[in-house]
């Protein structure tokens, strides 16, 4: 259908205008809070940072609901006929021709229409199953996606100075020239000497800093001949309010870890988000675009792109969904597609007898994880509703488990299986399986690494105000980089809501030996001394854990962590090794000079 001039001014045109106005309002608010991240960083308003991240998550759904309500009240959305809806989509496309965020606006259109239309309309005639507007080479009106620098006149040191100063932070640096010297020597060491500069030598830097927690990140790449060198420079602030360059990350894989879904989302002021994603993809080609959008705070766009990728993969693969390996959970039913690196989780209709909660509580726990700082220790999830899969792609075991444990969560419509509510997250090897493999292989070095990681995960979550609740090995996974991450959320609580207690002495020897509890226990009481009994049954594992994390087995650590959180203290979490920090490399600089 071609767009007719006669459609302008019609009901369809007014509906399309209402929808683009709804999106524009959303993105204006999104950019405003992202822009304010610079001020929060300068003012060291760390509690404000966490508050802003939590509030921003609600922005999208609030604007979608607002737009749906407007269409229902102003246009009687339920009575709009099919022809008009098709015209609305075509007119909406016309409104996106010169838009700076067309891909986000298309996703907003989908979010609104799928709340109004039946799923039979979820195809490209009515919604954007495929994108309609190219996002290639969109230029901003007010800002550049990236800035280019040439070291011919100022030299490399002078150019790095200019790059940092161009971010215009309203805080003094402790000693910027000294930090730049560190940058220079770190680069020279990484490259085993400075290569000759080609005629096209330049440094490209994304125009907005990336703000998260207590850090600002400068992200860019150097181009020399046919070679590109990605880099990231974290900028931190000391207690005196002075800034300093903490390190420079030069390995692409290490930069990629900054964008891990187990970490909090960035705040970035982007006029053209597709330009930022395109730049990031040039330095992180293995990172899916969907994950980059998510980490930029654009979760709905990330979900849209993820699902398009999944459907595309299903069209080009033949394997079937199977039950995920590992011990079956009491709350979640989990399956996976072997050829795709994700797991799919449903909330069961009936939980195990030891679980005292309902479906609504579980959903709140998953939302809680999105709103907190995951500090690289909690897997992010993508939440979907009414997802259609080819029925033939499920093996008999998965279908039987669905029918037995979650019959209200799915339905079959012809050759499609529709799952009403679903969480999707990155697949990891369950820690209990990994430990068993390492013990059987007598791989002591690897065993020590993951047990140390396990304790560090618990410690860092606690410092970020999260108590995992069920700390059994099966509730943690091991990433492909060897990092231990928590992924079972039905029992998590805020640290500040837990009462950590020491087990009181038994009144007599007989009582102590009886195996019965001799003290009163309330719902949120936790006794850290009991952890070893349930978790450290293997002598080898127990020895390693106590070597690194003995303090986690006493109330003192937990009470001190609570006290810090309640006082408003925000812990420092570094998404890179301590040995890379310039403060720990002073001798390297002295030796090179």
From Swiss-Prot:
Location of the protein in the cell: Cytoplasm
Active-site residue numbers: 380
Catalysed conversion reaction: L-seryl-[isocitrate dehydrogenase] + ATP = O-phospho-L-seryl-[isocitrate dehydrogenase] + ADP + H(+)
Superkingdom field: Bacteria
InterPro entries linked to this entry: AceK_kinase, AceK_regulatory, Isocitrate_DH_AceK
Function in brief: Bifunctional enzyme which can phosphorylate or dephosphorylate isocitrate dehydrogenase (IDH) on a specific serine residue. This is a regulatory mechanism which enables bacteria to bypass the Krebs cycle via the glyoxylate shunt in response to the source of carbon. When bacteria are grown on glucose, IDH is fully active and unphosphorylated, but when grown on acetate or ethanol, the activity of IDH declines drastically concomitant with its phosphorylation.
Family matches, as NCBIfam families: PRK02946.1
PANTHER family given in the database record: ISOCITRATE DEHYDROGENASE KINASE_PHOSPHATASE, PTHR39559
Family from the record: Belongs to the AceK family.
Entry protein name: Isocitrate dehydrogenase kinase/phosphatase
């Amino acid at each position: 259908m071609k767009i007719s001039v006669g459609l302008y001014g019609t009901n369809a045109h007014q509906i399309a205008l209402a929808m683009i106005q709804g999106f524009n309002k959303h993105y204006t608010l999104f950019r405003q809070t992202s822009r304010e991240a610079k001020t929060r960083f300068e003012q060291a308003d760390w509690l404000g940072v966490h508050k802003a991240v939590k509030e921003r998550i609600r922005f999208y759904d609030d604007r979608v609901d607002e737009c749906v309500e407007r269409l229902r009240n102003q246009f009687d959305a339920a009575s709009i006929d099919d022809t008009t809806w098709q015209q609305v989509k075509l007119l909406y496309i016309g409104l996106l021709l010169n838009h700076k965020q067309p891909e986000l606006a298309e996703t907003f259109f989908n979010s609104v229409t799928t709340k109004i239309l039946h799923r039979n309309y979820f195809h490209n005639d009515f919604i954007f199953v495929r994108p309609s507007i190219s996002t290639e080479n969109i230029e901003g009106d007010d800002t550049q996606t990236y800035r280019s620098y040439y070291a011919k006149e100022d030299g490399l040191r002078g150019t790095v100075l200019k790059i940092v100063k161009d971010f215009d932070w309203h805080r003094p640096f402790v000693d910027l020239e000294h930090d730049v010297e560190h940058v220079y020597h770190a680069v020279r060491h990484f490259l085993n000497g400075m290569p000759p500069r080609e005629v096209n030598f330049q440094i490209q830097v994304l125009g907005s800093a990336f703000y998260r927690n207590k850090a600002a990140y400068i992200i860019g790449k150097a181009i020399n001949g046919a070679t590109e060198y990605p880099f990231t420079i974290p900028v931190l602030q000391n207690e005196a309010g002075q800034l300093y360059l903490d390190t420079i990350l030069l390995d692409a894989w290490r930069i990629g870890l900054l964008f891990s879904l187990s970490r909090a989302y960035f705040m970035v002021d982007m006029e053209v988000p597709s330009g930022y994603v395109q730049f990031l993809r040039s330095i992180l080609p293995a990172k899916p675009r969907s994950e980059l959008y998510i980490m930029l705070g654009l979760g709905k766009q990330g979900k849209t792109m993820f699902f398009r990728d999944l459907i595309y993969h299903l069209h080009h693969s033949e394997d079937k969904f199977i039950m995920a390996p590992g011990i079956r959970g009491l709350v979640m039913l989990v399956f996976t597609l072997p050829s795709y690196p994700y797991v799919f989780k449903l909330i069961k209709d009936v939980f195990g007898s030891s679980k005292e909660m309902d479906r609504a509580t579980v959903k709140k726990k998953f939302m809680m994880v999105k709103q907190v700082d995951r500090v690289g220790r909690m897997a992010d999830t993508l939440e979907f509703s009414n997802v259609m899969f080819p029925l033939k792609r499920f093996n008999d075991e998965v279908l039987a488990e669905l029918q037995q444990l979650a019959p209200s969560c799915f339905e079959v419509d012809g050759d499609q299986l529709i799952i009403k509510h679903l969480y999707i997250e990155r697949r990891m090897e369950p820690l209990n399986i990994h430990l068993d493999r390492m013990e059987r292989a007598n791989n002591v070095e690897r065993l020590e690494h993951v047990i140390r990681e396990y304790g560090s995960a618990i410690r860092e979550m606690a410092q970020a105000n999260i108590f995992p609740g069920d700390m059994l090995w099966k509730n943690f996974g091991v990433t492909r980089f060897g990092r231990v991450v928590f992924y079972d959320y039905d029992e998590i609580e805020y640290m500040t809501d837990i009462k950590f207690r020491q087990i009181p002495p038994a009144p007599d020897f007989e009582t102590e030996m009886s195996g019965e509890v001799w003290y009163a226990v309330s719902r949120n009481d936790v006794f850290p001394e009991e952890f070893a009994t349930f978790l450290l049954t293997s002598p080898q594992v127990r020895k390693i854990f106590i070597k690194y994390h003995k303090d986690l087995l006493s109330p003192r650590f937990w009470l001190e962590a609570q006290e810090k959180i309640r006082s408003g203290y925000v812990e420092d979490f570094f998404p890179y090794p301590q040995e890379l920090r310039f403060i720990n490399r002073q001798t390297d600089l002295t030796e090179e000079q």
